Amino acid sequence: MTEHFDVVIVGAGISGISTAWHLQDRCPTKSYVILERRANIGGTWDLFKYPGIRSDSDMFTLGFRFKPWTSAKSIADGPSIWNYINEAAQENGIDKHIRTNHRVLGADWSDAENRWTITVEADGEQKQITASFLSVCSGYYNYDQGYSPEFPGADDFAGQIIHPQHWPEDLDYAGKKIVVIGSGATAVTLIPSLVNGGAAHVTMLQRSPTYIGSLPLVDPVAEKTNKYLPKNLAHFVNRWKAIAFSTAQYQLARKFPNYMRKTLMTMAQRRLPEGFDVQKHFGPRYNPWDERLCLAPNGDLFKTIRAGKADVVTDTIAKFTETGIKLTSGEELTADIIITATGLNMQLFGGASLTRNGQEVDLTETMTYKGLMLSGVPNMAITFGYTNASWTLKADLVSEFICRVLNYMDDNGFDRVEPQHPGDAVDALPFMDFNPGYFRRAMDSLPKSGSRAPWRLKQNYFFDLRMIRYDKVDEESLHFTKHRAAVSASSS
């Protein structure tokens, strides 16, 4: 017999655990299951194993609202974050609802049956589970394959070529010369860690620079609040201080980009060797926050460069050679290991198909409602966190909204909710005002956002807080209906 749940959650990372906790807290009668394709929970924090893997957002906001992050260490390493997520699941009994090694292949909404049928692969076999509501918490990138461009001559290189998404556990890089291709968060994290791990020298090879900011590894305010305030009050203060700071610096960057650019350049110059060309190597052509700002805790990357253990080369690749990389300028970089920190491949729904009555949903024809539902797709929410703040802030709001919608439907006898596309009343805009490579490569396959609320995706926590947590649920863009289908519910 096909199992049926009130809610099926896809993904057991931060978003999935947040959704489960909110369901237990606010919709305690709802049955649910979490389907996780990997052998462990944790999502990103279970996948990436490269040296130095850490958060690039503060833990007071990357952590859950319901589980205080009690350390004053605001930037945490990957294993600590994985342990934190695992503890959150175990402490709240969420782990009992998680089915690992369950890969979702597709989800089909039936208007006639008024439910989702989710096709899952587990233990080499396919089976189906049905749900009244679907919560997609599978992130936004391809877990199987990172982005790696074609490099001429790659087969000629005598050393190892490694993508950080598939880091070998037994890699010995002590005493080796390493070239890291890329200048994003992964490269910025890797370089100091490789040096600390014994690499002879590391070169960051970038086609163009990235803005890099520096923050204390240990938050001085949190040190005091954690010492003198009760745990929950300290968490409240630390969290809201972090929210206010990140929001303010983002808004400042967008309104006064030249000021923010100058500030970042000055901060970098102070930490780098005398005569270092900061503009060439850390001065992008775009404005701050057109792409995500990278973080160097305690300025670790700058310190590594200053110590002579690492350097930066801004150039393009002509070809790989047997001993390294030849650049278009004619310079050659020798290397024992080349790491291609060249980014992600964007992928919504974890690669699963999304259909309605057996017909594929064309995402490019949909519009995001409050950044968490799609027009023309009933009884489904998708969690897509912030690009300019902690992912979890948005994940928590999405989880709250799911519960508000489910409770409203129960209270009023509805069983279907569907955002109605506004048509010509709202101009269609790109999914997000964000411009890194992985977004640009996927833009033609993404949903649209709208020119005004509730269709506009603003990447602003305070705007979303009002719109998602406090605005009324029963507004004209969200269509609630009754379609009672005879679904026999059984759940574990």
Curated annotation (Swiss-Prot):
Monooxygenase able to convert a wide range of ketones to the corresponding esters or lactones via a Baeyer-Villiger oxidation reaction. Can act on long-chain aliphatic ketones (2-hexanone to 2-dodecanone) and on aromatic ketones (phenylacetone and benzylacetone). Is also able to catalyze enantioselective sulfoxidation of methyl-p-tolylsulfide. In vivo, likely functions as a BVMO, but the exact nature of the physiological substrate(s) remains to be established. Its cofactor is FAD. It catalyses: ethionamide + NADPH + O2 + H(+) = ethionamide S-oxide + NADP(+) + H2O. Binds 1 FAD per subunit. It comes from the Bacteria. Pfam families: FMO-like (PF00743), NAD_binding_8 (PF13450). NADP(+) binds at R54, S55, D56, S183, G184, A185, T186, A187, V188, T189, R207, S208. It is found in: Cell membrane. GO terms for cellular component: plasma membrane. Induction: Repressed by the transcriptional regulator EthR. It comes from Mycolicibacterium smegmatis (strain ATCC 700084 / mc(2)155). Keywords: Cell membrane, FAD, Flavoprotein, Membrane, Monooxygenase, NADP, Oxidoreductase. Its EC number is 1.14.13.-. Its main location: membrane. FAD binds at S15, E36, T44, W45, D46, L47, D56, V104. Belongs to the FAD-binding monooxygenase family. The keyword Acetylation does not apply. GO terms for molecular function: flavin adenine dinucleotide binding; N,N-dimethylaniline monooxygenase activity; NADP binding. This is FAD-containing monooxygenase EthA. The record marks R292 as: Transition state stabilizer. It is an enzyme of class 1 (oxidoreductase).
